[in-house]
């Protein structure tokens, strides 16, 4: 028996968009960091929690060994207080479950975050398809556009018959 599940990745925030690949490294994508911060603020997380999660994701994926302000590199994950001992991946995320490796993730309801956040392997995609969003996706739209959830709900419910060309 083989089971599969299709997920529409045009209506969620791709965690791999937090970094932009360069020839020698992956650099923070300020726009995507802002979108994820907005989203987590809408979900009532504190700035401290948000900064820790974002920094730890970036450190998990980037190529360098320099920890961000609230992040960790190999020295932490291979140290005596971390079991099992492991190294940062230094690659894009393949699965949402990789967040379980990050200490900051313990302060988040990861099942709840899955409604709004996804991992698209091998992709740094940052865009969403506004025309396929449903009412319950208003938080995603509000996070991307920097608007209120009420305004995002209004846009979704008043989507033109032919869809939005741009917003």
Predicted regions and their residues:
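Compositionally biased linear targeting/interaction segments
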Residues: 1-167
